[in-house]
Every structure is written in C-alpha cells, then in structure tokens.
Amino acid sequence: DLTYRGSAPAPLMAYGDSDQITLFGSFLHVLGPDFGLGWVVTRNRSEAMIAAKFRNNLTLGDSALQRALADYMAAGRYERELRHLRRRLATAVESGAKLLQQVLSRPFSFSMPAGGYMCWVRGGHGFDAAHVAHSGLKRGIVLAPGPMFSPSEGFHNFFGVNLSAPWGQYPANQLARMSELLTR
C-alpha cells in the first residue's frame, strides 16, 4: 500500500492457486493501532478461520466502526489518504536519504526503499548491528538490527533506520549522532 516508486509488488497469492496461502492486511498505517481493523483473504478456508476466531472467544470488531470504514473506502477517501501518505513518505525518505548519504562513510552503504519508511544500511564485514543498536539505545538513538527481521538471525551487519520524520534540525542531529556511534 505504501509504494511510491513504481508499482506495488503483487501479493504471493497472485502467483499461485494454492489453498495454503492466506493474505492478511490492516488499516494500521492510515487509521492507527487503536482501531484494530484489517482483513483476511483466503481461497477455501474463510469459514474455518471465522469459526476459529469465535472458538478463541475473539470478537469480530465494532460493527459501527466497520460500517464507517466501508463507507470511507467506498467514497474513495481511503485511496486519497494513501496517495497523500505516499507523497509525504516519498518526500521524507528522499530528504532523510540525502542526509544519510552525507553522514555515512565507508564501509557503510544503504539502499533506497521503493515504499514505506525504513531504509536499510549495510555495515562492513564484522559489523555487529545488534551490539550497535544496544549501545545506541543508551544514547537515545533507535536502530532496528537486521537479525530482528530474520528467522535465522542473519543480516548481522544490517540495520534499519526510520526515515519518515519531517526533516528538521532534530532528526538531522539524530543522524549525525548515529554516524558518530557507527564510527566508534
């Protein structure tokens, strides 16, 4: 939903007709976590999934809120909000990447995301992203170490940086502090 360069990749479900594929989604990025609304798309297991939800004594959510969200989407406001969010993210990420390019030195490199707000930075051989992230927390610098995103705890020399902030003096100072942390 948050792709701003090129078109969004198709979900795995588009590449096969397997009944084993289930697609989950939510409105978290537009509505926030308080609403807890999302969707599930599956080919042959939807009744079983709904039954399991009831068995686990979970509710299906607030019906008035669901109706309001359906009206919001039917009126095209969801798509309009997504377009606005994509433009804001593209601008913020581009500005953040320019700053990142200024503060990072070898052996660090990064890749520009095609959507979302995270930028992946690659450290040199032997760089321990988890150790640096832990040290950064003590200084108020938040990095997402690569092993957090790997089931095999790989990507030890990668970390993610959130570039979604409006780029004023404070975030720029944070990146400069991050650079100092990386060169220690």
Task: Go through each PLM region and give its residues.
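Conserved glycine-rich beta-strand-loop-beta hairpin in the small C-terminal domain of fold type I
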Residues: R86-A97, F108-R122
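Residue-level detector of anion-binding/catalytic polar loops
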Residues: V142
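Short, conserved charged micro-motifs
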Residues: G126-V132, Q169-N173
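Short hydrophobic/aromatic beta-strand micro-patches
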Residues: V41, W120-R122, N162-S164
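PLP-dependent enzyme catalytic core of the Aspartate aminotransferase-like
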Residues: K138, G154-R184
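Conserved core segment of the aminotransferase class I/II
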Residues: D17, I21-R86
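Conserved PLP phosphate-binding loop immediately N-terminal to the Schiff-base lysine helix
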Residues: D1-P11
